[in-house]
């Protein structure tokens, strides 16, 4: 098949007509039709927040990756734009993989991984991943500039560049895999086109994964955060229950100096579906993160409806007193609110109380008096398969989903915080 932006747009126009909207998100960002995974190129440019994403417009299955594109004035109401990148060049003939976006003067620059095989795709020795550049003056139509970093010798998995400006230089981190050890590699440039290898920023220790995908590196409240998505970490009790994780290392770094870790790897999200998060700065200086709300090899019942996957709501990051990242919905999410009503203070004993009927979307703000409840479990049920509750015996907050007809069953939980209120 010949891939191009015009062919992708024709396919999306046809498929969006037949899309079944029953489960299509009402306020999360999803593709017009087809497949979506990693968020890419989250950036403010010319008064708009631009969100690019990994996209297969020809199918609801993963396939040769394109870059889908949407923009928003408020982070919650999105306007779909034409596909930004298609795998139509020699350097990315098998896919335009994940990357990032930066503003360089009056130009919006996309830096992404060109994915290609030189021979049989079943043989990983034929895999080559290079870093590429595309630029735009209007933020919609992009001119391909070709490869800017070649695959390092002896390496095959080398992807997901994240670029930022620091001082007078551009810096880039790239995820890598060397002898089944995950790495984040560092590069420096004066012009986004000519890059110098600055070495290994961080590398997996035993048990920390064979590949580190989608790295992000930024300053937050005086600390440096290396956020990435490791593959190959084993589950440990309640932790790391998903196939792959997303999380971070905290430490200190200055240009030209090594990254000095201060903490162990910490998962960023303890739910079922959150992967490949990327961050960006708002014009007022807030650090916002958006992730992919699915997981590789998980059932995707929406595929039968002509689409697959969506992105998370924007979350604002901050650093807590215990050196842990805190996430809360960005303040722009409040713009989705409409009618509201209070629920009465309730004390129940082996009872159920219906609070809302026939509600399609809602926001719930809860205050639970955990210190004065003697119930083994108490919480909320949403519809027929979703529960959020406190388990007093385990002293954990639990999210349970049970949709056996779709293969979506299981629980995720976190310890209850100290104190009497939740």
Q: For each of these PLM feature ranges, what is it?
A:
Residues 39, 64-67, 96-98, 107, ...:
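Extracellular structured ligand-interaction cores
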Residues 235-236, 245:
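Substrate-binding cleft/loops of secretory-pathway carbohydrate-active enzymes
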Residues 35, 62-65, 94, 126, ...:
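Active-site-proximal structural scaffolding
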Residues 38-58, 81-82, 98-124, 131-132, ...:
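Hydrophobic core segments of beta-strands in well-ordered, beta-rich domains
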Residues 2-40, 59-62, 76-103, 139-165, ...:
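Surface loop/turn signatures of beta-propeller and other carbohydrate-active proteins
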Residues 66-74, 129-139, 184-192, 241-256, ...:
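Beta-propeller blade signature
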Residues 9-15, 244-422:
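Beta-rich accessory regions
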Residues 136, 234-235, 381-385:
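Short edge-strand/loop segments of extracellular domains
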């Amino acid at each position: 098949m010949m891939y191009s932006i015009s062919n992708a747009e024709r396919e999306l126009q046809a498929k969006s007509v037949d899309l079944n909207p029953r489960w299509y998100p009402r306020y999360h960002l999803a593709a017009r039709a087809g497949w979506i995974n990693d968020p890419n190129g989250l950036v403010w440019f010319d008064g708009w927040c631009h969100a690019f994403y990994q996209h297969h417009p020809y199918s609801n299955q993963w396939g040769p990756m394109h870059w889908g594109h949407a923009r928003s004035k408020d982070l919650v109401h999105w306007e779909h734009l034409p596909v930004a990148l298609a795998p139509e060049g020699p350097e990315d003939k098998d896919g335009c993989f994940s990357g990032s976006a930066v503003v360089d003067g009056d130009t919006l620059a996309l830096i992404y991984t060109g994915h290609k095989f030189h021979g049989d795709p079943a043989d990983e020795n034929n895999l080559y991943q290079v870093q590429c550049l595309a630029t735009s003056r209007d933020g919609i139509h992009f001119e391909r500039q070709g490869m800017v970093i070649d695959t390092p010798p002896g390496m095959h998995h080398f992807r997901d560049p994240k670029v930022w400006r620091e001082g007078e230089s551009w810096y880039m981190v790239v995820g890598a895999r060397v002898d089944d050890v995950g790495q984040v590699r560092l590069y420096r440039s004066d012009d986004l086109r000519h890059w110098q290898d600055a070495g290994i920023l961080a590398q997996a220790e035993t048990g920390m994964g064979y590949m580190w995908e989608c790295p992000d590196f930024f300053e937050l409240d005086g600390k440096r955060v290396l956020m990435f998505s490791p593959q190959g970490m084993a589950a440990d009790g309640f932790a790391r229950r998903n196939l792959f994780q997303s999380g971070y290392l905290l430490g200190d770094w200055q240009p030209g100096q090594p990254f000095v870790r201060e903490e162990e790897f910490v998962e960023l999200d303890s739910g079922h579906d959150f992967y490949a998060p990327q961050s960006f700065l708002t014009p007022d200086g807030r650090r916002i993160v958006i992730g992919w709300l699915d997981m590789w090899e998980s059932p995707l019942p929406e595929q039968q409806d002509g689409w697959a996957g969506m992105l998370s709501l924007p979350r604002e990051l901050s650093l807590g007193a215990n050196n842990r990242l805190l996430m809360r919905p960005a303040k722009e999410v409040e713009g989705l609110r409409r009618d509201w009503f209070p629920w009465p203070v309730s004390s129940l004993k082996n009872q159920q109380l219906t609070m809302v009927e026939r509600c399609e979307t809602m926001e719930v703000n809860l205050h639970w008096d955990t210190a004065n409840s003697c119930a083994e479990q108490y919480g909320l049920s949403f519809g027929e398969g979703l529960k959020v509750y406190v388990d007093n015996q385990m002293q954990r907050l639990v999210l349970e989903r049970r949709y056996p007809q779709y293969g979506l069953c299981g629980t995720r939980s976190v310890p209850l915080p100290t104190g009497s209120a939740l």
